[in-house]
Structure formats: structure tokens, C-alpha cells
């Protein structure tokens, strides 16, 4: 594919990229079955835009399966689950399996085995039972319908990509600049161009990071999650669909830092 650069008449040919389908991050959705349709079901499908690996009972459990074994052993207790979204509602507090899952997730949270994302459906209750207090102690979000999915997903992905930087040589774009010895490299020049873009020119900054990612990843093994996320954010930007919190840029910079750490 040929992509014209925005700074000159140069055209860069993208050869190929190696995409790793597997990804170590697994997210568990904890919710009341009464909230499944349509809200949770639709949110699960929305997350597929980003290539996240999500444990969701409607996808992972089949007719005839042992429900408890699947939900608990392969779900909440699964050592591969390192993030969990807890959807609290009036239905949730009176639930059955979801409360058993929640208890396990909470125990794992206090052991630093997982990270919790508390989400309130509809309204945030003024008072909560003691066992649910952590949902208000932690930074939380609340959602009403599909219009809230994008902001929630971006918060989740921002945290995951930030955590990935623990295994990255670079923690910021500026770190890459300081480390780069070859000042004639196309990578170095594109990063400098990115830094020179006016901070308020948000659309151009996203486009710049996307093309930098395309070039940097063309001969390197990258995660399906990263590739889907970068593409989704870029194409949403092309449609001028952005949220006010501007999490997109933070996510893209995190992915660039991780990608360059394995160059």
C-alpha cells in the first residue's frame, strides 16, 4: 500500500507486517444475566473493534457445559485473566453466579493478581453494601447506553497499554528521541515531525502516529490488539468521531513506545 506523507511529496510503500493473533491480556466481564441484553452483549461486541481478548460467557460457554466450572474455573479464577470489568446494577447486587465471580475477583484484586474496572449501569447509588464499597473507592465509570461505550473502552485500553510500558524500553515519545542514535533514520525524522505538530492539531497528531506505526511495524511482530486499536482510532479520527477526554492520543503513544522498544 502506498501512503502519501503529509509533510512533502514523498510516498512510503508499506511492505507487510507480522501480526500475532495471540495476546496475553485477557479481560473478564462480570455482570448480572439480567443486564446482558442488550447492554453487556453489545459492549462485548464493541470491544472487538480493538482486538481485545475478552472472556464472555455467551461466547465461551456452550450448551451442555458445566456452568460453574466454565464461569469460575475458566473465567474468574483463570490465571490468564488479568483485568476484569465489574458492571454493578440493582440486578447485580441480587445476582447469583455474578456475586460468586465478584467474590473471587475481589480476592484476586487484593492479591494484586488482577486490575478491576468498576462500571455502574445507569445511576451511581449514594450508598452501597460494604462488599461493594470498593466500586466507589476505585476510579469508576457509569454507562447508560451504547453512546457511552467508546469512552469506557478507551479508558480500559489506556490502562492496558500503560501497563504494557512496564515491559517497554521507552516510556514516552521523548524517550525514543533521546535514545535514537541514527538521526538520518526515517523513524527519527517522523518522530521529530510528530513532536513539531501543534498540540491542538489533534487530528494531524493521530494521523502522524498512525503512519509512524505502519512503517515501524511493517517487518516486526505486533499484537493483533495493537494493530486493531491503532486502525480503529485512526479511522474514527478520519470520521471526526472523538471523545472529549482525548484518550486516543495517549493510547497511540503508548503503543508506539512499546513497538519501538522491540525494533
Question: Which residues make up each language-model segment?
Answer:
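Conserved N-terminal substructure of TIR/SEFIR domains
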Residues: 1-83, 113-114, 188-263
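Short, highly charged low-complexity linear segments
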Residues: 146-152, 179-187
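Cross-kingdom TIR/SEFIR domain
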Residues: 1, 44-165
